[in-house]
Amino acid sequence: MKIMFVSLGCDKNLVDTENMLGILRNRGFEFTDDEYEADVIAVNTCCFIHDAKQESIDTILEMAGHKKDGKCKALIVSGCLAHRYHDEIEKEIPEVDALLGTASYDKIAEVVLSVLEGKGYSCIDDADRLVMTKDERIITTGGYYEYLKIAEGCDKHCTYCIIPKVRGNYRSYPMEYLVKQAEQLAEKGVKELILVAQETTVYGVDIYGKKMLAELVKKLAAIKDIAWIRILYCYPEEIDDALIEVIKNEPKVCHYLDMPIQHASDSILKKMGRRTTKQELKDVINKLRENIPDIALRTTLITGFPGETQKDHEEMLDFVDEMEFDRLGVFTYSPEEDTPAAVMPDQIDEEVKEQRRDAVMELQQEVSLDKSEEMVGKVIDCLIEGKIEDDDTYVGRSYKDAPNVDGFVFVKTDANLMSGDIVKVRIDGAMEYDLIGSLCD
């Protein structure tokens, strides 16, 4: 009995997929990457923004075709789209045999067995349920880096975001559970742990009564075979001295912070339900750079939020120009059902949203090139990810680069390197988002 998984959306969703794979492996199921060979196809979906929702729907419909044209006997849909739109999916896509909500993925084995027996099965548990599996997950990232999801849900309730509705309130995983998971990953050869959650910076508040991210990082850093620890999804207003100190002083922690700010206009930040002002954002950025001069800061922005004026947009451009983020991504605003922002007045035309996004990215391209050129002549550590076929060039990442969202370091050498090796590289050339270097002797 062969199962194929399609995992869509964010890295948090990927962790859920890997957990489901681990559960099924321990129940004796086999896996395939070929949808034509699969007896069961499972799609773990996303619906964070319109494009993600559409990708999920298109993928479900594509996989549904294999119930007619392939070996597929059952189609299972899990994740955010299944949780939010389970009634609509059951009505509109009858080929779907089972639905699993975001807090129900640990029941995947029972679901598979049920649908193979010809029984329909939908399990949409309360989004606030915290799933902790005993089964070791299956690594799908290549084996040298992995995501460690330290919490579920979110309590911030930004006006544009549906995450609290589909992922529930903020729930931290117990520290001992996370340390055990990290130890298991290290035993499998993982070198880089990437801490993720809807928000990492308030880890522990709900179960320990105070923020405990810094303490968690210290415990993870004590694991022998973990070489790098990277922290994503930090809310700027929650970055405290304890976190800054552990990033500064713990050698295994990458001098890198992903800190989504979404906008730089005070009026738009307020409409978004964000809890910072432009000046407060400047203050935390300056504080991070004063304490950790070589820190790489990544952020994300949203253009075209309802009511965004040309003046608001220019404030964003000025902020990007002044703050010089090392890494930056931009999304156009996507109105989501059942969110306050979707019914706000002064919705922005798609063309204007895209023009403003392009303007920010054009500016950031210049900033990124300047930042890259500053690296020329420096020697840095790189984690090797692979080799370009028929070329003496390896592909790696520096501490400044998170996988899948940032750039690469192309390393020229005739040495025999392995994926997962961490090597010293001298930077010889720079592009907007990537670096070129040579292996140090």
Predicted regions located by residue number:
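Conserved, mostly hydrophobic/aromatic
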Residues: 178, 195, 231, 259, ...
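Conserved glycine-rich "GG(E/T)P / GGGxP" loop and the immediately following alpha-helix
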Residues: 47-52, 190-215, 219, 223, ...
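Terminal RNA-binding accessory module
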Residues: 343-441
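Active-site proximal loops enriched in glycine and acidic residues that flank catalytic Cys/His/Asp
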Residues: 197, 233, 261-263, 299-303, ...
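Proteins enriched for Cys/Gly/acidic motifs involved in redox and nucleic-acid/cofactor modification
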Residues: 1-203, 242, 253, 257, ...
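Short, electropositive alpha-helical surface patch
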Residues: 208-221, 241-255, 308-325, 350-355, ...
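Conserved strand-turn element in the central/C-terminal portion of the radical SAM core barrel
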Residues: 161, 165-168, 228-237, 263-274, ...
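Radical SAM/AdoMet-radical enzyme domain recognition
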Residues: 187, 214-215, 222-223, 228-229, ...
